[in-house]
Amino acid sequence: RKLKENPTIEEIICAPGNGGIAADAKCINVSAIDLANMVEFAKNEKVDFCVVTPDDPLAMGMVDILEMEGIPCFGPNANAAIIESSKVFAKNLMKKYQIPTAGYAVFSDAQEAINYIRTQNRYPTVLKADGLALGKGVLIAQTEEEAVQAVNELMVDQAFGQAGKQIVIEEFMTGPEVSVLAFTDGHVVVPMVSSMDHKRALDNDEGLNTGGM
């Protein structure tokens, strides 16, 4: 909506869009992960600037491809987006640069993960699929049985496909979860107002995680 208020912008096109956005932008029926058709559409429409926000196309390198075609973008390239698309990478990055984070261990073998759970015997414990899972790849186990079930769901049953090829088993931390975002051009950082993502499906912060609201 803020883009629409800018007098220098002639038209806003959103793909794939939805009923709410349709009031402010022209919506086209192209999947966000259909990079080839998305880039082709942007070229044909002579798009001057592209804002790429969903996790999947960022991880797949949409910004890289568009910029190679001469279309400037707002959004990280694939090398930067891996901070969001791989929890293992993000945790190891924080460890490398001594950024405070919950204690964790990484596993690519289900039985090794189960052995670790039984050795630690600490609950609640948090299990996370390494890759993108629409905000649903984080499971909080209250018991050993739930933790083992979560490992099998993520790694054996592959509930989230390749996203669960590796998992992170993480220390459970209590307290309000806050999202702090910022804009940067690589030199200057401008923070936005902090917010809270209400991820649980039920009231009183109960139920499974969702994509968030």
Region spans (language model):
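ATP-binding N-terminal substructure of ATP-dependent carboxylate-amine bond-forming enzymes
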Residues: 1-78
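Short beta-strand-to-turn element immediately C-terminal to the catalytic PLP-Schiff-base lysine
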Residues: 107, 138-143, 182-185, 192-193
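Short acidic-hydrophobic, aromatic-tinged amphipathic segments that line or gate anion-handling sites
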Residues: 27-34, 105-109, 141
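A conserved helix-loop-beta module that forms one wall/lid of the active-site cleft
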Residues: 75-137
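Short, charged, surface-exposed secondary-structure boundary motifs
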Residues: 23-24, 39, 82-88, 202-204
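Phosphate-binding core of ATP-grasp and ATP-grasp-like enzymes
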Residues: 154-155, 173-213
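Conserved ATP-binding module of the ATP-grasp superfamily
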Residues: 100-103, 122-127, 141-179
